[in-house]
Amino acid sequence: MKSYGGLFERILDPANLDAALERAARGKRERAPVQRLLAERATALPRLREELAAGTYRPRPYEQFSICDPKPRRISCAHFRDRVVHHAVCAVLAPLIERRLIADNYACREGKGSHRALLRAQGFARRHGWYLKTDIRRYYDSIDHVILLAKLYALCREPALRRLLAVIVEHPIPGKGLPIGNLTSQWFANLYLDEVDHWVREVERIPGYVRYMDDLALWAHDKERLFALAADLRALLAARLALELKEERTLIAPVGEGMPFLGWRVYPGLLRQQGPRLRRQRRLLVRREAQYLAGEIGADKLQDCVRALAGPRKFLGYGEPLRSTIDV
């Protein structure tokens, strides 16, 4: 992996910090901490820059809350000032990480996303007889900091930047785990499994492969090849990344049975939304309709909800055979 210099200076550039503030504030300008930092940006950003340059910057405590989407998740929300730092760091590091990633890694990347991952998966299902679908047990919570920092340090050679990355990674709990919700966590988690992507493509020579963060799907012409790959993948994850597969979610089956992937079931000629996702969407629409009838939201908000729910169906040709616009 190529190592780069001059990155810390680019992160501290006043223009980069100012742009990071604007990106972090997008869609959140009505919140008090955001308004406060925007109002004080003339003094707050230079002060933040001084802390970063001196190595005295320390993140503030996280605000934590739980969601169920559909399974329970603990979300850690960084202080707005720290989110500005995350955006400033990612503006410089993300393009370097991006160069490492294979084309069929679809999470948290511009021009990718879950819909394109589904279409790509369907393209592979049309050309192979069997699939292997699996994911990582407690992925974000299991990311080893020593292993992750070694991967990040391979990108940058400046001690000051390495110290800043260690501060971000080790907060709030040192040793293991990344908080779900941070922009840095998304990019770092994507990089962490990049070794697996290159192993699948360059060592095992498997062309039929799609990853969406910790959801992995592989295709082959015979199930014996996939059983062997699953065993090798378990060994690689344990030895190199201190991770393990969810055995109860590891499936090897004919493509004609449909592969569960990202809330959908992928068939060679059809994409079908799975029950839990569909029920969540219906409940959301019922809530929005009730809010509209009660006068709590306007017609524009209700229409936004309807468009958001209908968008994936239109893009994916939900419920009918697809004529894919993606080159597979």
Predicted segments with their positions:
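Intrinsically disordered, low-complexity and often Lys/Arg-enriched segments
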Residues: 1-10, 235, 322-328
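Conserved two-metal-ion catalytic palm core of "right-hand" nucleic acid polymerases
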Residues: 1-157, 172
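Gly/Ser/Thr-rich beta-alpha loop segments that engage phosphate groups in nucleotides
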Residues: 34, 179, 183, 265
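Conserved polymerase palm-domain catalytic core
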Residues: 44, 51-52, 103-104, 109, ...
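Right-hand nucleic-acid polymerase module
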Residues: 78, 87, 224-228, 245-328
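A generic structural signal for residues located within well-ordered alpha-helices
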Residues: 80-84, 184, 188, 257
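PAPS/PAP-binding and catalytic site of the sulfotransferase fold
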Residues: 88-92, 230-233, 237
